[in-house]
Amino acid sequence: MATPDIPDLGFDDLDDALGFDLDPLEDLETESQHRITTRKMRSDLKHETIDATKRQALAEVMPALPGPGECYHIVSNGDFDYWTWIPVMIGYMGRADEYYGSTWTMNRRNVVGMMEMIDRGLIVRAAVVTGLYFKRREPAVYATLFQGLRRRGMRFACLENHTKVTLLANHERGDYLVLEGSANYTANPRIEQNIILNSEAVYRFHQGWLDEVIEIGRDEEPQD
C-alpha cells in the first residue's frame, strides 16, 4: 500500500518542528491502519482460495490414505506444497493422535494453520523440530510457533536441522503415516519429491530419533 502523501511542512528550524501540532497526523494514521487491515482481509481470502485449490490438487493425486504396508513415491510440480499433506491426510484419518513435524523453515500461515488444528482437536499431541536458520531468518514467525506450542503444552526444538519428515498417527484406525520429502513447510512452488507410507515400524524409527532431538534441542523463550 502506498504511503499517505504528507506535504512538506517547510520548518525553518528545529524549534518550529518540535512545536508542531501533531493532531492532524492522527487522522492519517487511522486511515493508514484501516487500509492495511482491508488489504490483509483481501490477502487472507486469496490465500484461503489458494489453499483450498492446493488441497484439491493433492486429493486428486492421493484420494485415500495408503493402506498398511503401502508406499507411494510422488513427484509434485508446485500445485501443492509440503504442508498441504497435513490437513488432507488428517481429513482422511479424522484426527491425528500424534503429529511430528520436522522442517528447516516455516511460514506464518502454516504455523497458524497448525495451531488451529490443535485447537479444533484435529491434532491431539504435537512435536515440532525446526532449523536454526528459521529462528534467525524469521524471528517473528519463530516466536509465534514457539509460544503457540508452549501455551498448548506441545513440544518444540530448534537446532541445526535440515530434515523434512512428517508423522501422523491414529491409533484406533491403526494408521501410522510417514511422509518424507525435499520441501519445507513453506509455500514455494517447486518440483519436489515425496514418499508417503503407512508403516508403524518406519513411524517408530523416525519417532525415536525425533524424540531424542526434541529432548536435547529444546529451545528457550525467544528474546526481543
Which positions does each model-derived feature cover?
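PLD/PLD-like phosphodiesterase catalytic module centered on the HKD motif
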Residues: 1-224
